[in-house]
């Protein structure tokens, strides 16, 4: 029995560990360190219809317990992703989750329609929550009606299940999650980065050229856990949880909160082996906690019927 196997819409995962979009590129660099087939899946970097060069530098700044980034969805564009990046990943035994982004609804629809046809793309991650772009991005993820409409339009053209990435920069994330579920989303991924800023002590000006950036890393884990805990009780579609995950213990916490799988982001920059290390350590942690299968942990913080053996 594979104690870590997880079944989600469109995704048969040998384990629930997925490198998060934006922190793993298209896997090429990490493939030099280990066989990517050990992973549950990969969320590739956000793809837009046309190439994007991102925001001006500086666009990364360290913070206590994390980092700020304002990359701005830099990517080579749909054509290169389809003709080069996705074919490269075909050598690995794992389903790919394609992250879809755009400036307007038509952009999302065009990318989703094309990229969902790729043979190794088993699901889409609809990026309606990037805080670092002037148009699109978070603008689609902070209004329930707009988020639902975009979800519905993408679902109509996608050939694979659609997961929607939620922004934490909202007043009521449950309301938005339910609107997206009602629009036909197959799952949710959460959370994206929190909007933040750093100032230069000598100039008193923002360190990032974009002024603000997305905060990620261990600092946001408590916020992410709280939001997964709230949303998982309000919807009936699976959640891929993310936000500050660095260890096997972090993974179990997200499962307790209600996640069905997890994505590891910023930690990949610190330790390129973090994902395989977590995968290796999870079985022993399940033994220590008294679980036969990782699914027994799902929603344990609020499901009264969940018991360890």
Swiss-Prot record:
One of its GO terms (cellular component) is cytoplasm. Its cofactor is FMN. Binds 1 FMN per subunit. GO terms for biological process: 'de novo' pyrimidine nucleobase biosynthetic process; 'de novo' UMP biosynthetic process. It is found in: Cytoplasm. Its EC number is 1.3.1.14. The active site is at 130 (nucleophile). The keyword RNA-binding does not apply. FMN binds at residues 21, 45-46, 99, 127, 165, 191, 217, 243-244, 265-266. Pfam families: DHO_dh. It comes from the Bacteria. Heterotetramer of 2 PyrK and 2 PyrD type B subunits. PANTHER family: DIHYDROOROTATE DEHYDROGENASE (FUMARATE), DIHYDROOROTATE DEHYDROGENASE (QUINONE), MITOCHONDRIAL-RELATED. Belongs to the dihydroorotate dehydrogenase family. Type 1 subfamily. HAMAP family: DHO_dh_type1. This is Dihydroorotate dehydrogenase B (NAD(+)), catalytic subunit. The gene is pyrD.
């Amino acid at each position: 029995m594979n104690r870590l196997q997880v079944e989600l819409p469109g995704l048969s995962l040998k384990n629930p560990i997925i490198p998060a979009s934006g922190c793993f590129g298209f896997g090429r660099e990490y493939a030099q360190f280990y066989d990517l087939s050990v992973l549950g899946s990969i969320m590739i970097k956000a793809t837009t219809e046309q190439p994007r060069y991102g925001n001006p530098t500086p666009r990364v700044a360290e913070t206590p317990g994390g980092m700020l980034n304002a990359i701005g969805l830099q990517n080579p564009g749909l054509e290169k992703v389809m003709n080069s990046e996705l074919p490269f990943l075909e050598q690995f035994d794992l389903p790919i989750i394609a992250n879809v982004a755009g400036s307007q609804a038509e952009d999302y629809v065009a990318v989703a329609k094309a990229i969902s046809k790729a043979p190794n793309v088993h699901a889409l991650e609809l990026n309606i929550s990037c805080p670092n772009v002037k148009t699109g991005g978070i603008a689609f993820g902070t209004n329930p009606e707009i988020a639902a409409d975009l979800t519905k339009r993408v679902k109509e053209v996608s050939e694979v299940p659609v997961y929607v990435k939620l922004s934490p920069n909202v007043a009521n994330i449950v309301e938005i999650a339910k609107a997206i579920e009602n629009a036909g989303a197959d799952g949710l991924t959460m959370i994206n980065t929190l909007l933040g800023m750093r100032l230069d002590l000598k100039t008193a000006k923002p360190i990032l050229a974009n002024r603000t950036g997305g905060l990620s890393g261990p600092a946001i884990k408590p916020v992410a856990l709280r939001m997964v805990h709230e949303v998982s009780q309000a919807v009936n579609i699976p959640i891929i949880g993310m936000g500050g995950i660095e260890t096997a213990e972090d993974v179990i916490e997200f499962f307790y909160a209600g996640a069905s799988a997890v994505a590891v982001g910023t930690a990949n920059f610190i330790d390129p082996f973090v994902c395989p290390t977590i995968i290796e350590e999870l079985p022993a942690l399940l033994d220590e906690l008294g679980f036969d299968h990782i699914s027994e942990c799902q929603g344990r913080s609020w499901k009264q019927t969940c018991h360890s053996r």
